[in-house]
Every structure is written in structure tokens, then in C-alpha cells.
UniProtKB/Swiss-Prot annotation:
Organism: Homo sapiens
Name of this protein: Sterol regulatory element-binding protein 1
Transmembrane annotation, as ranges: 488-508, 548-568
Record note on what altering residue 482 to A does: No effect on proteolytic processing
GO-annotated biological processes: cellular response to fatty acid; cellular response to starvation; cholesterol biosynthetic process; circadian rhythm; fat cell differentiation; insulin receptor signaling pathway; insulin secretion; lipid biosynthetic process
Coiled coil (residue ranges): none
Keywords tagged on the record: Activator, Cholesterol metabolism, Cytoplasmic vesicle, Disease variant, DNA-binding, Endoplasmic reticulum, Golgi apparatus, Ichthyosis, Lipid metabolism, Membrane, Nucleus, Phosphoprotein, Steroid metabolism, Sterol metabolism, Transcription, Transcription regulation, Transmembrane, Transmembrane helix, Ubl conjugation
Segments in the Lumenal topological domain: 509-547
Chain intervals with Pro residues compositional bias: 96-105
Length: 1147
């Protein structure tokens, strides 16, 4: 089989393929290639004399000198010395060569005969030597070096086989015709001189697993002699062509037939136990062809190629090979350790130190992160490029910030940037007629019609990937909308056209005949005669002109309304650039609201409105224009014209998707306006009353235009916020608009859902409506901290108004009990307790629908959908209801509410004010004496009363300038404690009736402990009456009771009771002052005074004998109307006692 030419390219190609050799084998191959390439310096004087011949020719193989027989086995010394001399000769200078000729056909290679029997473990390899012949001697130029060799004693070749190796038939030729020279193979670095047939040495190694044959360029280098062949051969220059064989072992052989020695360099492996048999080399010379077999030892392990060294340095070479492998292993270990450390460091940078990933996953994550950084860097470069281009346009800093901050103009700006960048970075064509070619510096290719890259292999520039990948995100022309100044200017123009009516003037001026038409003048040489006026004027124009003018005016108004409401409204399509900016700022506003950063939340909401194409006014002119436009728009929407046109915002075509997007855009803008209005009302957003009014009207108009996209609760809340703004910002003369907006909210709820949201049901109640419209209250910027209700959402003003209304209900209920209507003939006198229970029931419903403390700060949520329970207000309502039920002697209803009052809410427990604890202990004392569980009567109830009295005194001492509701609660608790102590004293009275003949001294007095406690509570009541005048009525009654308990003089007691029995008014102008200093007693106080006077005063203080029974009967009738069954029961018991002793008294 023909062998390919031997070159370095073939070697590199073979080395590039996968193999089982390790890095040491590749290193040795590179070292050997370096030795081969540097053959000039390694073997100086190879072709110097005395080996150089005449230079023109050599010994002809066909001459008689070369055909004489001779011995084939010269002495070994001669052969060895001849080979050394041949290898040490210098290289001759190259001579000009002729052009190359066609390559000769080499002779076939035949295996050797099996006469040689190698030992075990040794394989036999045949090395046939074939002489390549060519007809004409034409060497290659620059590739072959002519050599000349000396002609020693010519040995004779024998045609008979040597050493039992028969000559294969027709296989070898040993000579060439006279005068012919041989041409070496092209590509060989070393060639025979002209006239000398080159001999190629073919080595074939058989192995168990066939490997790829590696061939390298051979240099005349030889290892120490391992095999010596003694033969008597002819002096024939032999082309040494050793072959590197990639197999289980590697062999490099070189032979030279110079009549002296033949050297075979075998590269033995470093593996211990590898032996090479050094015996006589079986050689067959037949017709000038040398066939040699070399026994080799093939090892199954990997065998590195050793450096060529002398035979005497074999131990040192083996030692260096071991040191080299050790060093190589250390290098590999350091290399792998460095790789592992860098991979671990890369993992820590990309995914963190806690993650557990393999090397492949770490590299994959790193690649993804690098791509993300590249994409981010590209976006930043694009933004930087856009900013630089905007700066080059000589824009001011304000315009630049506004252009970059507005989401709607970002894409338009980038389009202009892209065009300018392409024009800047793309050089012009060389001439006008040449086609446009994309420059390598250009960011995008315009040569392609599709806008892609100029070539198929080059991708588009990543600067404009976003604009190419998402072309649908560019905002359309109608989505930008009109500014409020433009809207107001258009409205002003329409108003001027309708008021001045320029169309009528214009058409009327054209319709009237001109003077040249009415009067004609005839010129003649003599006289000028005036023509007569034409009386046949166009009468039809007078009737047709007004309808045409009004038709044109109506068309102008219609076109203006369409421009304002249909094509002037900004519509933000989903997944567009402005929509992305809007939701980004809105989500950030939600986060800022949750953190309590209200100023930053207001800034984010402002940017969100800019993204929607609805920027807030920044100057006074813009604010005035925006406010006037919103007023005009609200009036038009009340006429249903504006609302019908706004429902078709974006276009008059029947596009359902566009209408849905327009409604959603209006809803989002309305919610943002509403939240900004709430922040402004709570003092979290800067601006005056005009700014707040503008925000309220904008939210209301857009919410009405959104239609079904806005929930009923949200729409009602926006109406209530507008009513709140009217009451807060507008003068009192315009407060009637509050009723209008509240009515609109109620109608909106009832028309769509049929029910009012729970958080706004109190607005539909007459009491709540009256409180909202006529109440004297104001919204504070800080949450209202109170003991009687919890604060709601701090950014919702309606939650604060609801909290104020709950406290108002509690105060009204307390006033019904402690200070009812003083008019004796009032129709409401018998409804004091029922009115109080009605207020408390409304308070409970408001407490159940109040905003929970864990409110939601989302812009889309509202108090209308977020409900909770106010436990504090509910506890106070339950306490007041329990006391009222005890006074009405409705013990079953009181017991149902007692479990709610027994446990004080956590907020009141953590409070430092003693008033809640005083209320709790007062309830416990009243329950022990007035309730069903009367087992704790006596000393235990007195102990509870003492605790309650102590907390009440602390409350009066710590809060001298308390609010009206605090004073009402303190009066309620103080009166309750005095009633409990009075009931305890009455229970200790004997059951016998009080005869009229007995004096007060005969009645049992209260103990010192009871009197001391009663005086303590009475002093608290006097202290409260100094700042709260309605408490003075109770002071007179309880002071008379204290004198009765102590058995004091009845004269002073009668005077105190007389203040409650007689209703005196001041004379004339002093009546108001007297009424202010001494409040008129209520009907309950009058009945209580009658009961005390008839029961405990001596008979001498009564005017008639039957007056006691009459007083008791009158007191019973009054208490029955009031519904105080407790005192009514005591009065009836006294009447029964007096009925048995009437005869004694009258007699």
C-alpha cells in the first residue's frame, strides 16, 4: 500500500486527533520535532569531506564495480565507524534544481519469511527496502540537497537469498539502467545524491489493538546501537526514513548501508521489565533490495518517547524521566487546584456561598449572568447614547429630564436617536451612483429592505434590539392626548365663535349686494346718468342664512367635543411602554405607602400620571386651566354628553378592545388622582385648596368615564371624597354641594348593586348624614389618638371622619343618660333611654365595619372593601348599654352584654390613662349591687367602689382640660358610683314604712366608711361641675342624699331638694344668666327629688297631710314615662307602705 508523503502538516493533523497518550507523550513529540527541525545545528559537517564526492555523480549501481560479489558481513568495527563518519559529515550547499517531475511508483512491500523465530513476547517486524526509480534525473528545486559519498571497496551484491530468506518473485529490483539517476519523493527533506537510488525503510508494527500510524520527518539521528548486522554490502546511500508508530509501544529505527555498520535505534519504554533482544539482524539482500526484520518488545502500557541520548547515559536518562513525570504530576495538580479554586470563587460571585452546584452548573450560571450583564450594559449604552444625542440638540436640562422621564416620548426619542446615530456613524458612499453599503461602524444596516443586517451572517446591532423586537409598543398618535391648556383654549375658541358668531357676519356680508350691483353709473361724453336700484333682491338668502349659520356652529361644537373627549383623551394600551412605566411607578408607590414614606409615594404617583400622559399642573396658569377644564367637563358629563363621548375615547370606530383599554386607562388614572387627593387631604402632599379641588374633580370625572371598569365601592368613595373636599376647601355658602355629592354616591350604590358598602352605611343614616353635612369637625394630618375608638387608615380621610362619628355617637348616648332634655313637657322625655340605645346600636354597626388596624395600602383598595372591627368603641358602647339596661331593670339584656365588658381591650390595658380602669371597676361595683349577681353586696362591693373612686380621682387630676366626651364619661362614671352607694345604703334600711310622725333622727345612719366613700365621690362630682356645668344639677341631688345618709339637719336638706323640685327662671334679661349659672333640672332629677322628700323628710316640711302620697304618685308617673324601672319599683314599694299607714298619718 502506498504511503503518503511525510511532512509536518501530516504530523500536526495526526496529533490533533484524540489519542490515549497523556501530556508527557505530547511533550516528547514536540521535543523530537524541535530536534528534527534543528538538524543543521545538531549534526554539523554531515556532508563535509572526506564523504563528499565530486558533486556531480556517484557510483552507478549498474556498473561492474558495484556488481562484483563480496562478503555481506564486514567487521563490526568498520561498519560502526563508517556510520559514525557518515552521520558526522557536514551538509553540502544546495545547488539549483530542476522543476519536479511526476512522483515515481514505489515497489510493493512484502512481509518477511518466517525463518526467524523470535522469543516469547517479541513480535517480528519486516522492514522492506525498496528503491524508487524514475526515468530522468530531475531533482526538486529548493527541496533536495545533492550529496557526494566516497567510493570505498565496492562490495558485490548477491542475488541469492541470505539467511534463508528467499527473494520474493518480482518483488524487488536492485539496479537501474546506466545513465539513469533516481529522483526522490517530493516533500522529503533529505534525498540521495543524483545517481544514487534512495532506499525507503518501511516499518510495520503489529499490535493487539491497531492504532493510527504517525509519520514524522526523519533526521539522521540515531540512538545507541542495539542491533549490529555484519554484512558485506555495496556502498549504497540509503534514505533513512524512520516511522513513528502509535501503538502499544513506539519504535524508531534507522538503517544505513554504508558497508560498515547498520544501526537500529529502538526507543525502549521506561516501564520496568521491558527488554529488547539484541541479536544478529536477519537481513535479505536481493537485487539491491534490503529486507530486514527487527525484533521488538511491545508493552501494553503507555510508552513516552524519550529524548535521544547516548547508550552510556541510560541510567541517568531513566532517572530524568522519573523526575520529569513527578514534576509533570505536580504541575498538573497545581493546574487542577487552580481551576477548582477559580470555579469555587466564580460560584461564590454568581450564586452565593450557600449554593451547591457542580462545575457545569456554575459555568452555566456564570454564562447566563455574563449575558445578563452584557444586556444591561447594552441598555445603559443605549440610554447614554440617547442622552448624548439629546444634549447635542442643545436642549436644556429641564427638557432633557422631562423627555427622559415621560414614558410616552421615550420610544419617539429613541427613533430620532437611531436615525441620527446611523447618519453620524455611517460614512457616505464613494460616489453618488454607487449603491449604499453598510459601514462596519454603523449601528444598523440600511442596505437591506427589511431593515435587517446587510449580510446574512452578521446579526443586527443590539442597540436597537428592543425597538425591532417590540414594534407594537410604540405609542400611537391618539394615545398621547391633549394638555389641559389646549383643551381650555379650544373651549374658549368655541365659546367665542358661539358668542360673536363670526360665521353669520361673514356669510351675511357676502350675501348682501354690493354698491356696484345696486347702482350703475353710465358714463357719456356729455352727462352721467345714475341707474336705478334693483328692487328684486335675493329674498331666499334671508331665510336660508340663519339655519346654515346655526348648522355650522353646531357642527363646530360637535367637532370640538369629539376632539376633546374622543381624540383628546390619552389611551394607554396594555403591555406598551407607557403602561410599563405606569405600573412600575404605581407598584413603587404601594411599597412607599406600606413603609410610611408618603412623600416618596406622592412623587411616584406623580410620575405614574406622567406615564399615562396626564401630567399634573406645575404652574399657576396650568392649575387654573386644569381646574376650569375639569369644571366644564363635569358639567358636560352631568348632561350625559361628555360621558357618552368619553365612552368612545380613542376613536369613533367600533373597536371593543380599544374601548376596554380606554376604560382601563381612565380607571387607573382615576385611582391615582384619588390617592393623591387623599394624601393631600391628610397633609401628606403639598399644594393648596385649588390643587386639592383639581385632584378631586379629575378623579371624579375619570371615574365616571371609566364606567363599569370602576367598582361601585370605589366610585362611591370618590364621590364622598369630593363631598369632603367641598366641606373642607369651599366656603360655607357652597356647602350645599356636599349633599349633592353624597346623594350621588348613594344613588350610584343603589343603582348598580342595590346596597351600600358597610364602611359608608352610616352616611346613609340620618344621624350620619347630619353629622357629615352640619357637624363641626375637621380632618387632621396626624391620626386621631383616642381612648374611645381606634384610628383607621392614616391616608384615608374618610376613615378619620368615621372615627369622629363613632365618638360622636358615644357622646350622644352618654348625654341621653346623664343630661337629658331639661324641658318637662318635651315629647322626647320618655325616649331618653331608647334614644341612647339607638345611638349605641348605630355605634356597634359602625364599629363592626370600621377599618382594621392592619389596613391595606394598595392604591386599588379602599376602605369600602376593607372592613374590620373597632374593639375599643364596641367596648364603650357595651358598657353604656349595660348601665342603661340596669337602670331600666332589664337584667337579661344586661347579662347578655356583660361578657363583652368584663375583659378590657388590649389597647386600653396598655394605655397610661386611668379612665378605662375606673370604668371597668365601676362596672364591677354596679354589677354587684344592681345586677343579678348580688352575692357580693356589702364590704366586697364597697372595696370595688373604693378602687373605682381612686381611678376616677386620678383621671380628673391628670386631664383637667379634657374634651367634651371625656367630661361626659367622667360624669357618667361618677354618677354611677354615687347611685351604687345610694342603693347600698337603701338596702340597709329596715323594711318598716317611714311614718310621718317619726323624725329623721330615728332612721339608721350610714357607717363612717360609707359616708367617707360617698363624700369622696361627691367631691369628684363637684370638681367636675366646675368645668362642666351640666354636672351641677346632679351635685344638688347627691348632696341632699349625703345629708340624709349622715342624719344632718333637714332644713339644709330641704333647701337642696327644693332646687330640684322648683324650676325657677331668671327675671327679664337676667334669665339667661341664671339659666347658665343654675341649669334647670331634668324630669328624672325632679322625680328623684320627689321620692327622697316624700320618704325621708319630716312631716313638718310638708304642707298638707296627703302631700306625701301625691308626691310619690307624681314621681311614679314620671319614672314610668322615663322608663326608669329601678326607681319606679322603689316608688311603688313606698306607696304600698304608705297605704297601710295613711290612717295613722291623717288622724
Amino acid at each position: 500500500m502506498d504511503e503518503p508523503p511525510f511532512s509536518e502538516a501530516a504530523l500536526e493533523q495526526a496529533l490533533g486527533e484524540p489519542c490515549d497518550l497523556d501530556a508527557a507523550l505530547l511533550t516528547d513529540i514536540e521535543d523530537m520535532l524541535q530536534l528534527i527541525n534543528n538538524q543543521d545545528s545538531d549534526f554539523p559537517g554531515l556532508f563535509d569531506p572526506p564523504y563528499a564526492g565530486s558533486g556531480a555523480g556517484g557510483t552507478d549501481p549498474a556498473s561492474p564495480d558495484t556488481s562484483s560479489p563480496g562478503s555481506l558481513s564486514p567487521p563490526p568495527a568498520t561498519l560502526s565507524s563508517s556510520l559514525e563518519a557518515f552521520l558526522s559529515g557536514p551538509q553540502a550547499a544546495p545547488s539549483p534544481l530542476s522543476p519536479p517531475q511526476p512522483a515515481p511508483t514505489p515497489l510493493k512491500m512484502y512481509p518477511s519469511m518466517p525463518a526467524f523465530s523470535p522469543g516469547p513476547g517479541i513480535k517480528e517486524e519486516s522492514v522492506p527496502l525498496s528503491i524508487l526509480q524514475t526515468p530522468t534525473p530531475q531533482p526538486l528545486p529548493g527541496a533536495l540537497l545533492p550529496q557526494s559519498f566516497p567510493a570505498p571497496a565496492p562490495p558485490q551484491f548477491s542475488s541469492t537469498p541470505v539467511l534463508g530468506y528467499p527473494s520474493p518473485p518480482g518483488g524487488f529490483s536492485t539496479g537501474s539502467p546506466p545513465g539513469n539517476t533516481q529522483q526522490p519523493l517530493p516533500g522529503l527533506p533529505l534525498a540521495s545524491p543524483p545517481g544514487v537510488p534512495p532506499v525507503s525503510l518501511h516499518t510495520q508494527v503489529q499490535s493487539v489493538v491497531p492504532q493510527q500510524l504517525l509519520t514524522v520527518t526523519a533526521a539522521p539521528t540515531a540512538a545507541p546501537v542495539t542491533t549490529t548486522v555484519t554484512s558485506q554490502i555495496q556502498q549504497v546511500p540509503v534514505l533513512l526514513q524512520p516511522h513513528f508508530i502509535k501503538a502499544d509501544s513506539l519504535l524508531l529505527t534507522a538503517m544505513k548501508t554504508d558497508g560498515a555498520t547498520v544501526k537500529a535505534a529502538g526507543l525502549s519504554p521506561l516501564v520496568s521489565g521491558t527488554t529488547v533482544q539484541t541479536g544478529p539482524l536477519p537481513t535479505l539482500v536481493s537485487g539491491g533490495t534490503i529486507l530486514a526484520t527487527v525484533p521488538l518488545v511491545v508493552d501494553a502500557e503507555k510508552l513516552p518517547i524519550n529524548r535521544l541520548a547516548a547508550g552510556s547515559k541510560a541510567p541517568a536518562s531513566a532517572q530524568s524521566r522519573g523526575e520529569k513525570r513527578t514534576a509533570h504530576n505536580a504541575i498538573e495538580k497545581r493546574y487542577r487546584s487552580s481551576i477548582n479554586d477559580k470555579i469555587i470563587e466564580l460560584k461564590d460571585l454568581v450564586v452565593g456561598t450557600e449554593a451547591k452546584l457542580n462545575k457545569s452548573a456554575v459555568l452555566r450560571k456564570a454564562i447566563d449572568y455574563i449575558r445578563f450583564l452584557q444586556h444591561s450594559n447594552q441598555k445603559l449604552k443605549q440610554e447614554n447614547l440617547s442622552l448624548r444625542t439629546a444634549v447635542h440638540k442643545s436642549k436644556s436640562l429641564k427638557d432633557l429630564v422631562s423627555a427622559c422621564g415621560s414614558g410616552g416620548n421615550t420610544d419617539v426619542l429613541m427613533e430620532g436617536v437611531k436615525t441620527e446615530v446611523e447618519d453620524t456613524l455611517t460614512p457616505p458612499p464613494s460616489d453618488a451612483g454607487s449603491p449604499f453599503q453598510s459601514s462596519p461602524l454603523s449601528l444598523g444596516s440600511r442596505g437591506s429592505g427589511s431593515g435587517g443586517s446587510g449580510s446574512d451572517s452578521e446579526p443586527d446591532s443590539p442597540v436597537f434590539e428592543d425597538s425591532k423586537a417590540k414594534p407594537e409598543q410604540r405609542p400611537s398618535l391618539h394615545s398621547r392626548g391633549m394638555l389641559d391648556r389646549s383643551r381650555l383654549a379650544l373651549c374658549t375658541l368655541v365659546f367665542l365663535c358661539l358668542s360673536c358668531n363670526p360665521l353669520a357676519s361673514l356669510l351675511g356680508a357676502r350675501g348682501l349686494p354690493s354698491p356696484s350691483d345696486t347702482t350703475s353709473v353710465y358714463h357719456s361724453p356729455g352727462r352721467n346718468v345714475l341707474g336705478t336700484e334693483s328692487r328684486d333682491g335675493p329674498g331666499w338668502a334671508q331665510w336660508l342664512l340663519p339655519p346654515v349659520v346655526w348648522l355650522l356652529n353646531g357642527l363646530l361644537v360637535l367637532v370640538s367635543l369629539v376632539l376633546l373627549f374622543v381624540y383628546g383623551e390619552p389611551v394607554t394600551r396594555p403591555h406598551s411602554g407607557p403602561a410599563v412605566y405606569f405600573w412600575r411607578h404605581r407598584k413603587q408607590a404601594d411599597l412607599d405607602l406600606a413603609r410610611g414614606d408618603f412623600a416618596q409615594a406622592a412623587q411616584q404617583l406623580w410620575l405614574a400620571l406622567r406615564a399615562l400622559g396626564r401630567p399634573l399642573p406645575t404652574s399657576h396658569l396650568d392649575l387654573a386651566c386644569s381646574l376650569l377644564w375639569n369644571l366644564i367637563r363635569h358639567l358636560l358629563q352631568r348632561l350625559w354628553v361628555g360621558r357618552w363621548l368619553a365612552g368612545r375615547a380613542g376613536g369613533l370606530q367600533q373597536d371593543c378592545a380599544l374601548r376596554v383599554d380606554a376604560s382601563a386607562s381612565a380607571r387607573d388614572a382615576a385611582l391615582v388622582y384619588h390617592k393623591l387627593h387623599q394624601l393631600h387631604t391628610m397633609g401628606k402632599h403639598t399644594g393648596g385648596h385649588l390643587t386639592a379641588t383639581n385632584l378631586a374633580l379629575s378623579a371624579l370625572n375619570l371615574a365616571e368615564c371609566a364606567g363599569d371598569a370602576v367598582s361601585v365601592a370605589t366610585l362611591a368613595e370618590i364621590y364622598v371624597a369630593a363631598a369632603l373636599r367641598v366641606k373642607t376647601s369651599l366656603p360655607r355658602a357652597l356647602h350645599f354641594l356636599t349633599r349633592f355629592f353624597l346623594s350621588s354616591a348613594r344613588q350610584a350604590c343603589l343603582a348598580q348593586s342595590g346596597s351600600v358598602p358597610p364602611a359608608m352605611q352610616w352616611l346613609c343614616h340620618p344621624v350620619g348624614h347630619r353629622f357629615f353635612v352640619d357637624g363641626d369637625w375637621s380632618v387632621l394630618s396626624t391620626p386621631w389618638e383616642s381612648l374611645y375608638s381606634l384610628a383607621g387608615n392614616p391616608v384615608d380621610p374618610l376613615a378619620q371622619v368615621t372615627q369622629l362619628f363613632r365618638e360622636h355617637l358615644l357622646e350622644r348616648a352618654l348625654n341621653c343618660v346623664t343630661q337629658p332634655n331639661p324641658s318637662p313637657g318635651s315629647a322626647d322625655g320618655d325616649k331618653e333611654f331608647s334614644d341612647a340605645l339607638g345611638y349605641l346600636q348605630l355605634l356597634n354597626s359602625c364599629s363592626d365595619a370600621a377599618g382594621a388596624p392592619a389596613y391595606s395600602f394598595s392604591i386599588s383598595s379602599s376602605m369600602a372593601t376593607t372592613t374590620g372591627v373597632d374593639p375599643v368603641a364596641k367596648w364603650w358602647a357595651s358598657l353604656t348599654a349595660v348601665v342603661i339596661h340596669w337602670l331600666r331593670r332589664d337584667e337579661e339584656a344586661a347579662e347578655r352584654l356583660c361578657p363583652l365588658v368584663e375583659h378590657l381591650p388590649r389597647v386600653l390595658q396598655e394605655s397610661e390613662r386611668p379612665l378605662p380602669r375606673a370604668a371597668l371597676h365601676s362596672f364591677k361595683a354596679a354589677r354587684a349591687l344592681l345586677g343579678c349577681a348580688k352575692a357580693e353586696s356589702g364590704p366586697a362591693s364597697l372595696t370595688i367602689c373604693e378602687k373605682a373612686s381612686g381611678y376616677l380621682q386620678d383621671s380628673l387630676a391628670t386631664t383637667p382640660a379634657s374634651s367634651s366626651i371625656d367630661k361626659a364619661v367622667q360624669l357618667f362614671l361618677c354618677d354611677l358610683l354615687l347611685v351604687v352607694r345610694t342603693s347600698l345604703w337603701r338596702q340597709q334600711q329596715p323594711p318598716a314604712p317611714a311614718p310621718a310622725a317619726q323624725g329623721t333622727s330615728s332612721r339608721p345612719q350610714a357607717s363612717a366608711l360609707e359616708l367617707r366613700g360617698f363624700q369622696r365621690d361627691l367631691s369628684s362630682l363637684r370638681r367636675l361641675a366646675q368645668s362642666f356645668r351640666p354636672a351641677m344639677r346632679r351635685v344638688f341631688l347627691h348632696e341632699a342624699t349625703a345629708r340624709l345618709m349622715a342624719g344632718a339637719s333637714p332644713t339644709r336638706t330641704h333647701q337642696l331638694l327644693d332646687r330640684s323640685l322648683r324650676r325657677r327662671a331668671g327675671p327679664g334679661g337676667k334669665g339667661g344668666a341664671v339659666a347658665e349659672l343654675e341649669p334647670r333640672p331634668t324630669r328624672r332629677e325632679h322625680a328623684e327629688a320627689l321620692l327622697l322628700a316624700s320618704c325621708y323628710l319630716p312631716p313638718g316640711f310638708l304642707s298638707a297631710p296627703g302631700q306625701r302620697v301625691g308626691m310619690l304618685a307624681e314621681a311614679a308617673r314620671t319614672l314610668e314615662k322615663l322608663g326608669d324601672r329601678r326607681l319606679l319599683h322603689d316608688c311603688q314599694q313606698m306607696l304600698m307602705r304608705l297605704g297601710g299607714g295613711t290612717t295613722v298619718t291623717s288622724s
